[in-house]
């Protein structure tokens, strides 16, 4: 049977995600971000809730991406997630895209010209942002022209690179409805951005999500809920360059601005430059918030939930993969668990995220109904 992998954040889970799951074939394995997102922000609802949303709408198995895979630039995010999916026996990678490119051809180009492409990337000016460098590389070697600020393009190409290195087939699906960052109230296929922005509009949320009651009744957070803690971390840390990926230039910029801003968004605006994108600054602020340092990625894979079909698939791979279904006296990934503890500080109603939690079980897969 085909085992299809999907890399996701589900922040929150919406009708577009449900459509993607409906298009995927076979056993559907989701590698999902935990409580902090790829672009450096807290999830609007916790990872257990988002996992349940996915399992109730077509997913068979949801595993958690470690913190230092989740909160990364597109290439590292995709590479880490796809390598985990490959270990779980995934042979097909499904992802949404706003423009259907010949991803198979692009993957072949990368396999055949990987060293040249990576060398080209390293030669690009440091004045360019990472997305701009990637755009130049793909334009040079694959003839692709696109906006370097379009996240789905950047992620789609990152998935292509990662899948080609793991021998995984690609299954791109045309994105339905609103664009990735659209905040418009497109009711049937609203974007996650729009649903977060208009979360207080119950009618809109109910139209845009298949799990609206679960979402609306769950404790929610935004970046600003952590601003006081972030400010404390910045002002009391003796050397911010000890934090993961924070260099002296960024440390000085953050330190000099934190006294004069009242929101996370203001701080991001003050610190970001053409070279350091807002997404990168948000990631760095997330690392500071968590007090993250460079750490090895855990070998074990943490399971958030499964259906009966997903549980059977886990049994078929457990001899070759170290699976964690309950975190107790032994840690899984100390950095991810620290991130979970910080995440809980954003809302007193957020349930325990780590200790003793067991996977959510959805008895019947939607595809079996």
Swiss-Prot record:
Gene name of the record: tmcAL
Protein origin, superkingdom: Bacteria
PANTHER family: TRNA(MET) CYTIDINE ACETATE LIGASE
Binding site for ATP: 7-20, 96, 152, 175
Function: Catalyzes the formation of N(4)-acetylcytidine (ac(4)C) at the wobble position of elongator tRNA(Met), using acetate and ATP as substrates. First activates an acetate ion to form acetyladenylate (Ac-AMP) and then transfers the acetyl group to tRNA to form ac(4)C34.
EC number of this enzyme: 6.3.4.-
NCBIfam families found in the cross-reference section: PRK13670.1
Top EC class for this record: ligase
Gene Ontology MF terms in the entry: ATP binding; ligase activity, forming carbon-nitrogen bonds; tRNA binding
GO cellular component, one term: cytoplasm
Species whose genome carries this gene: Streptococcus agalactiae serotype V (strain ATCC BAA-611 / 2603 V/R)
HAMAP family with a match to the protein in the record: TmcAL
Annotated localization: Cytoplasm
Keywords for the protein's UniProt record, in alphabetical order: ATP-binding, Cytoplasm, Ligase, Nucleotide-binding, RNA-binding, tRNA processing, tRNA-binding
InterPro entries: Rossmann-like_a/b/a_fold, tRNA(Met)_cyd_acetate_ligase
Name of protein: tRNA(Met) cytidine acetate ligase
Family: Belongs to the TmcAL family.
BP GO annotations: tRNA modification
Catalytic activity reported: cytidine(34) in elongator tRNA(Met) + acetate + ATP = N(4)-acetylcytidine(34) in elongator tRNA(Met) + AMP + diphosphate
């Amino acid at each position: 049977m085909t085992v299809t992998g999907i890399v996701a954040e589900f922040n929150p889970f919406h009708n577009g995600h449900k459509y993607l799951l409906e298009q995927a074939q076979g056993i559907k394995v989701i590698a999902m971000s935990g409580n902090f997102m790829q672009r450096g922000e807290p999830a609007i609802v916790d990872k257990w809730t988002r996992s349940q949303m996915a399992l109730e709408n077509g997913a068979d198995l949801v595993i958690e991406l470690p913190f230092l895979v989740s909160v990364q630039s597109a290439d590292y995010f995709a590479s880490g997630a796809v390598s985990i999916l490959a270990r779980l026996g995934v042979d097909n990678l499904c992802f949404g895209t706003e423009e259907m490119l010949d991803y198979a051809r692009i993957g072949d180009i990368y396999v055949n010209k990987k060293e040249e492409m990576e060398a080209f990337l390293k030669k690009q000016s440091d004045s360019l942002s990472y997305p701009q460098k990637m755009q130049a590389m793909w334009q040079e070697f694959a003839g692709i022209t696109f906006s370097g600020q379009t996240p789905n393009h950047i992620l789609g190409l990152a998935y292509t690179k990662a899948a080609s290195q793991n021998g995984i087939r690609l299954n791109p699906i045309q994105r339905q409805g609103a664009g990735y960052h659209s905040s418009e109230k497109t009711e049937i296929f609203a974007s996650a951005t729009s649903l977060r922005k208009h979360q207080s509009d119950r009618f809109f949320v109910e139209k845009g999500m298949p799990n609206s009651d679960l979402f609306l009744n769950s404790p929610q957070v935004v970046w600003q809920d952590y601003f006081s803690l972030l400010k404390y971390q910045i002002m009391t840390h003796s050397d911010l360059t000890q934090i993961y990926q924070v260099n002296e230039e960024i440390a000085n910029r953050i330190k000099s601005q934190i006294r004069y801003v009242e929101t996370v968004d203001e701080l991001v605006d003050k610190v970001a430059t053409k070279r350091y994108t807002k997404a990168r600054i948000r990631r760095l602020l997330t690392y500071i918030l968590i007090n993250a340092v460079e750490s090895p990625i855990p070998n074990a894979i943490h399971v958030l939930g499964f259906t009966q079909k997903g549980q059977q698939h886990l049994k078929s791979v457990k001899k070759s993969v170290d699976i964690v279904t309950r975190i107790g006296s032994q840690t899984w990934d100390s950095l991810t668990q620290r991130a979970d503890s910080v995440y809980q500080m954003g809302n007193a109603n957020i349930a325990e995220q780590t200790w003793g939690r067991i996977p959510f079980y959805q008895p019947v897969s939607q595809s079996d109904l």
